[in-house]
Amino acid sequence: MQKRHTFNTAQVMRRAEELIEASSNRYRITVQVANRAKKRRRLDNDDLEEGGMKAVMQAIVEMSDELAQPEIIGD
């Protein structure tokens, strides 16, 4: 049986596009998202087992929420 997720993948994709558009370097923002996801995965090992959002998606959501802070995506 497939688990039902409480998040909208279209919204996560839109947020990812916003992050990429706001950044001057696409590679750098991708690496930042990956590093944050890796850090989150280490902290929350059983996150997926509880039906939560994947670490990469959670990192995208967090970073898009922080767009107002230029040090997150700044050069």
UniProtKB/Swiss-Prot annotation:
A Pfam family annotated for this UniProt entry: RNA_pol_Rpb6
Keywords per UniProt: DNA-directed RNA polymerase, Nucleotidyltransferase, Transcription, Transferase
UniProt KW Transferase keyword: yes
GO BP of this protein: DNA-templated transcription
Catalysis performed (reactions): RNA(n) + a ribonucleoside 5'-triphosphate = RNA(n+1) + diphosphate
GO molecular function: DNA binding; DNA-directed RNA polymerase activity
SUPFAM superfamilies documented for this protein: RPB6/omega subunit-like
InterPro entries: DNA-dir_RNA_pol_omega, Pol_omega/Rpo6/RPB6, RPB6/omega-like_sf
Subunit relationships: In cyanobacteria the RNAP catalytic core is composed of 2 alpha, 1 beta, 1 beta', 1 gamma and 1 omega subunit. When a sigma factor is associated with the core the holoenzyme is formed, which can initiate transcription.
Record's function text: Promotes RNA polymerase assembly. Latches the N- and C-terminal regions of the beta' subunit thereby facilitating its interaction with the beta and alpha subunits.
Protein name: DNA-directed RNA polymerase subunit omega
